[in-house]
Amino acid sequence: MLKVLPIQSKETQESICRSAGIEYRPDALAYAASVDEELVGICQFKLTSEGGILYDIATVKDHCVNKECSDFEALFVMGRGTLNFIDLCGVHRAFYQGESPDDRLLRAIGFRPNEKGIYEINLEGFFTDHCHEHS
């Protein structure tokens, strides 16, 4: 079963960041994704006056060493869950400012590169207007 839950302690967040090979951001909020109780990924993000900023949607290294698996769905659900939280907080724009963006994943989540090449999404109605195309 897929679970996406907020990370409650900074020590846990730092440890997962180390496992994912990403920079730990102590001022960021974070979600962790697990499949069948196995940790698969982390998303670090922050709420700012400009919008929500996602810094990482990263896979924990070495969790699929002896088996074939894909983390795309777990990372997708975690990314969408993060955007939903940002939207529920009254912040209706989000940006991805990570080091190495996965274009396919970010586009599936709903981000699009803006004129400056920064992945961005307008969350106005994104989770409530199911009949409209969002870009």
Where are these regions (language model features)?
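Glycine-rich loops and low-complexity Gly/Arg-rich segments
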Residues: A28-A30, A58, K67-C69, Y119-L123
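Terminal substrate-recognition subdomain of acyl/acetyltransferases
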Residues: A32-K46, F95-S135
